[in-house]
Amino acid sequence: MIVLQNKKISICREITVAPEIVWDILTDTLLWSSWGPSLVDVQCRDRYIRLGSKGRVKTLLSFWLPFDIIEFRQMDFWNWRVGALEATGHKIIHDTDNSCTLCFDMPWWAVFYLPVCWLALNRIDTLAMIQVHSH
């Protein structure tokens, strides 16, 4: 589902896994390059991000950009700045104890990034299913 609201575009996907598992994947910097198609490496002092976490990400084009977490609400939403730009927001909507809707939002002018976010949503769904079935 794609929604345009408040000058932001959101792309969402329902994931039939407990919201806590999805949140763990979203906030664990060791997993970011597993689901983020535009990232190949992450360096951050905090394994699990929080408000004010800082680090750097290596892009597919092999250059590093600094990042900082500029908004963080536990089990709800986080947003970051990459380089000089506010980047994607990451939101979890709790549907049931065993499912949630995960949304990425971005400024309207970043519409070209929707396919990257769609791929990330699919990868997170796969990672979440693997975690459920491995426990």
Stretches with model-predicted labels:
Residues 1-45:
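Hydrophobic ligand-binding cavity/cleft-lining segments
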Residues 6, 60-62, 84-85:
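Glycine-centered tight beta-turn/hairpin loop motif at sheet-sheet or coil-to-beta transitions
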Residues 13, 65-71, 87-95:
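Hydrophobic/aromatic beta-strand elements that line small-molecule binding cavities or substrate pockets
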Residues 22-26, 32, 55, 69, ...:
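Hydrophobic pocket/interface hotspot
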Residues 43, 58, 63-73:
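A short, surface-exposed loop/turn module that caps and links secondary-structure elements
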Residues 49-56, 72-80:
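Short, hydrophobic/aromatic-rich segments at coil-to-beta transitions
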Residues 77-135:
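Beta-strand/loop substructures that line and gate deep hydrophobic ligand-binding cavities in soluble
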